[in-house]
Curated annotation (Swiss-Prot):
<dbReference type="InterPro" id="IPR050190">
    <property type="entry name" value="UPF0213_domain"/>
</dbReference>
<protein>
    <recommendedName>
        <fullName>UPF0213 protein LMOf2365_0181</fullName>
    </recommendedName>
</protein>
<feature type="domain" description="GIY-YIG">
    <location>
        <begin position="5"/>
        <end position="80"/>
    </location>
</feature>
<dbReference type="InterPro" id="IPR000305">
    <property type="entry name" value="GIY-YIG_endonuc"/>
</dbReference>
<dbReference type="Pfam" id="PF01541">
    <property type="entry name" value="GIY-YIG"/>
</dbReference>
<comment type="similarity">
    <text>Belongs to the UPF0213 family.</text>
</comment>
<dbReference type="InterPro" id="IPR035901">
    <property type="entry name" value="GIY-YIG_endonuc_sf"/>
</dbReference>
């Protein structure tokens, strides 16, 4: 279980192969909410979804900035971002 002081930017892969980036304090809970259709407009019709990437940040501000930057990327650049992050782990 995540501590309240943990902040995450996460990426879901949807059933239509699109990506959804979001912010949460608990990645496991948020994935379950997306799959249950709770508090999610975009992913509700694209279930099931799966967390394919997440990053931990010290502050909410840092995590939401990472989310906003990811959402601005083209699909090609999102793919490259995810590959680069996977290779660096």
């Amino acid at each position: 279980m995540a501590k309240a002081s943990e902040h995450f930017f996460y990426v879901l892969k949807c059933s239509d192969n699109s990506y959804y980036g979001g912010y949460t304090t608990d990645v496991i809970r948020r994935e379950a909410e997306h799959n249950a259709g709770i508090r999610c407009k975009y992913t509700k019709t694209r279930r099931p979804v799966k967390v394919i990437h997440f990053e931990k940040f010290e502050t909410r501000s840092e995590a939401t900035k990472a989310e906003a930057a990811f959402k601005k990327l083209s699909r090609k650049n999102k793919d490259a971002y995810l590959i680069q992050r996977e290779e660096s782990e």
